[in-house]
Amino acid sequence: SEMCIRDSQWLNDRGGIEADLTVSRLDETNFHVITSISSLMRDWSYLNDNLMTDPFVEDVTLKFGCLSVQGPNSRMLLQEITDTNLANDEFAFGTGQYSKIANENVWIQKLSYVGELGWEIFIPSEHMLKIYQTIQTQGKKYNLCNVGLHAVNSLRLEKGYRHWGHDIAAEDSLIEAGLSFTAKPDRSDFIGKDAYLTELSKGLPSRRLVQFKLEDPEPLLYHNEPIIMNGEISGYLSSAMYGHSVGSSIGMGYITAENLNQKTLNEANFEIEIATKRYKASSSLKALYDPEGLKMKL
């Protein structure tokens, strides 16, 4: 049976984002908390410092590996090596199930950090190589290839996905980061709730994470470039990369201005400065690629 998965931000008392991670429900009483390896000790400490009850918590990082199979053909490929029905009505986006691949037990969840149809497969470490080779062999006819973090970075930027440490951190709030949809203050209590509700009551923020796309397809962006709004420096890019699906360099960064919403952004004139030269850019609060998020849910 399916169990749900939630993207989650853990806040501090000021409402700042201390962690950005995924919580997967394995069964009625067991959960996986999944974070990036670079944040492991930080998030482990935060979790243990703030537990409200006394559950059993174990770091199983070294016991499991993860293979992420992403792309329009991911369902066809994986369906050939697992008995689990991967059809959309049987395996919805944002859910996970126990499954078997190459006769080994795995946990698979339908999620994507790159904005395409795909599954993340959590595998006991001793079976990683076997399952990797099974996927590679089966994937040849689908032109399966290995991709690195720069490719992932480009794809997640096109989808407007934030990266903790670059785009969101302890001094950034959910509202400033455009992540207030993840907060459910009416459902439960959480650290930073008072700060979040206070900020929410003030209306439109004066600082906001915005996505940018250069009009010129030639210049390259890397991050930290100044954002020019109506002739004045208004912020810096926190992340940037070439966006192959959208045909030019893209980035995101915080800008400071009054009454920030899509209307005020549309009325503003934006440029990004690269090595003292300024290039025109369009701005958006929505993802530059598949803004409705339909491709992941096919």
Residue spans for each PLM region:
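Short, small-residue-biased leader/transition segments that mark boundaries at the very start
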Residues: 1-5
